[in-house]
From Swiss-Prot:
Protein name: RNA pyrophosphohydrolase
Organism name: Caulobacter vibrioides (strain NA1000 / CB15N)
Coiled coil: none
Keyword Hydrolase appears in the UniProt entry: yes
Needed cofactors: a divalent metal cation
SUPFAM superfamilies: Nudix
């Protein structure tokens, strides 16, 4: 598929960060109420930006992580439409019908001390944990669930495990 496919969907990249033991990094969305407030890093692609460059940039901005090795990526765009409540808020939809995403899988090769939820001025997450890839579709907002199911299917060969929540410094 090309950039012209799904022209009403904002180009976006998503990142699944795998611990060396196969667990995945999950971030709890800052200021979003449970139960659907855990997700992977993701974000928009700048005009003319290479997709993998965008994925590495988003990962660094949202988590502080730069010590990674590429494991794989999804083929083509995976799309989702915004639900009516998002479409009704121009701040969130910004004229787009939804998002089209390419997902990247990386192995984390750094130390956990590298993870910094305040690496960028725009905080996306207020806590993080290692979890199981197969649990992620149940943790995400329902309108993104199909995307996460596709990502699980694409990257399941890299996965297994679970771990406790780690919060930003000063958070309970």
């Amino acid at each position: 598929m090309t950039e012209l496919d799904h022209p009403q969907h904002r180009p976006n990249v998503g990142v699944v960060l795998f611990h060396p033991d196969g667990r995945v990094w999950l971030g709890r969305r800052h200021r979003q109420a449970p139960p659907y407030n855990w997700q992977f890093p993701q974000g928009g692609v700048d005009e003319g930006e290479d997709l993998e460059v965008a994925a590495r940039r988003e990962l660094a901005e949202e988590t502080g992580v730069t010590s990674v090795e590429l494991l794989g990526r999804t083929e083509g765009w995976i799309t989702y439409d915004f639900p009516p409540e998002v479409m009704a808020n121009p701040k969130h939809a910004r004229g787009w019908r939804g998002q089209k995403q390419v997902w990247f899988a990386y192995r984390f090769v750094g130390e956990e001390s590298e993870i910094d939820l305040e690496a960028d001025e725009h905080i996306e997450f207020d806590a993080w944990r290692w979890g199981r890839l197969d649990e992620t579709p149940e943790l995400i907002v329902p309108f993104k669930r199909g995307v996460y199911e596709a990502v699980v299917a694409a990257f399941q060969g890299f996965a297994r495990g679970d771990s406790p929540v780690r919060r930003r410094e000063g958070e309970n």
